[in-house]
């Protein structure tokens, strides 16, 4: 899980 520039949690 990573947090992108717009504070959205993305699971890769």
From Swiss-Prot:
Modification(s) after translation: Not glycosylated.
Top-level taxonomic group: Eukaryota
EC code: 3.2.1.-
Top class in the EC scheme: hydrolase
Coiled coil regions, renumbered to chain: none
A molecular function (GO) term: hydrolase activity, acting on glycosyl bonds
Keyword entries, A-Z: Allergen, Disulfide bond, Glycosidase, Hydrolase
Function: Has weak beta-1,3-glucanase activity with laminarin as substrate.
Complexes and interactors: Monomer.
Protein family (similarity comment): Belongs to the thaumatin family.
Remarks, miscellaneous: On the 2D-gel the determined pI of this protein is: 4.4.
Protein name (database record): Thaumatin-like protein 1a
Biological source species: Manilkara zapota (Sapodilla plum)
């Amino acid at each position: 899980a990573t947090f992108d520039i717009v504070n959205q949690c993305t699971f890769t």
